[in-house]
Amino acid sequence: IVRRLVGSEMCIRDSSEILMHGYMNQEAFRLSMQTKEAHYWSRSRKCIWKKGETSGLIQKIKEIKIDDDQDCVIFKVALGGLKASCHVGYKSCFYRKITLEEGQYIDKLEFTEKEKVFDPHEIYGNAPNPTKL
């Protein structure tokens, strides 16, 4: 089904709340199907990684949908561990929003999650973090 690098959206099975966006190649998709746990292709490290392998934030796959071009998949998941998905400590990687105002360009981000679920330094230590906070 997946023969190239595809975008992968993760959302909570019961609420459809979007958790994160990642990428999968054919091998990551195969591993995800076999284990029923999300695996991704790291574009920066050039390797497959299993979500939660270090953090315990495992994503148990419950349902998979694929778009008409077969270049994007949506996984409905149940969260393991601390019930979070974002490596900076929030439940979702989509913890900020851009407010739309008529006729204006706004480049300010507004936080939608007020508190972190966990302290990322307790889990990841001083590992490099590419996220722009």
Residue ranges and their predicted role:
Residues 1-7, 11-12:
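Single conserved hydrophobic/aromatic residue that forms the stacking wall/gate
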Residues 13, 18-19, 24-133:
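C-terminal binding/interaction regions
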